[in-house]
Amino acid sequence: MSSSSALQPVIPAKPLCTPDGKVSHDTSSGTLAIKRAFQAKGILLADGFLSADGSLLADGSLLADGSPAAQSVDTVPVINEKDIAHRFSKAANQYNSIASIQRVIAEQALANLPHRLQGQALDIGCGTGIHTQALYRKGAAATGVDIAEGMLAFARKKYSDPIFIQGSVLDLPFTENTFSTVFSSMALQWVSDTGLAAKQIARVLKKGGVAELAIMVAGSFDELKTARKVAQLAQADMVMPTAAQWGYSFKQSGLSLQRVITKDYVDMHSDIMSLLRSVKGVGAGATGRKQPPLNRRDIKKLAMAYFNASGVESKLPLTYRVSHFRLEKR
């Protein structure tokens, strides 16, 4: 971890239930606030998260019947897989040194799995293979799949035991009912079709198999979006599906939702360039439309707006909102 950044996983505090069924979480000394509205059926766990049969009403992203609310055309992500593959391939050699917050999130997701695994395990969006190797150490016959050949070349060179294959989650190159475990951490936010991705995961899972998925969702990078707005800069194209949209897609695929927990992980940076490099270095924002580069004046305006809005002295927070899904194929 570089000296310019520090990690702070932020877990929502004890929830407060309002009379209309809303649950409010206050985090990070009031500088960040998470608000989620739930259908008032009493299907709330003690920690404020939904039980498996709950219907989420997250800022209108799901209607009362559990179906997704309509999105306007300009809020639908435009994903270019070739662009994403190219960006991640370029980042392969430096990815492990930059992606410190990704490691924290993946370690949490791996900790959610049993200590020992049996059968075959798939790591979707395996990147440099570090987490595929962790699945292998848990006892699984591990396979990593990624769209970025540069990442796979790095993984094959470093790890000899897992198998690494190029492929997309939208068209997984495996037969039905192959894997007892499917794992993915910080990769599925780049998906353009959550429904198709969910169906592919369900297809390759064996009956009784489990998927443990950590997915960055809408609400991530809000500080950066706010600072860009205050600085009157064009918004970067970083639209992500909501946790509710993913939940609906998994339900439609036939997978059983066992648990979903959404956490804010906050990466602290000492300056704006460190923050922007961390976003670019891990391939974030590779969603299709090109953005004009920031000039020196833009960067100065952005830094000033960020410091004024962050409320954290001498540090710039960047929030990764991640939903940890546990799914089962019955």
Positions of predicted regions on the chain:
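Conserved class I S-adenosyl-L-methionine
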Residues: 35, 73-116, 130-134, 151, ...
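A short SAM/SAH-binding and catalytic strip from SAM-dependent methyltransferases
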Residues: 181-193
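Conserved Class I S-adenosyl-L-methionine
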Residues: 259-330
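A short glycine-rich, Lys/Arg-flanked "PGG" loop and its adjoining helix->strand segment in the class I
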Residues: 195-210
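A short acidic, Gly/Pro-enriched loop at the edge of an enzyme's catalytic core
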Residues: 170-182
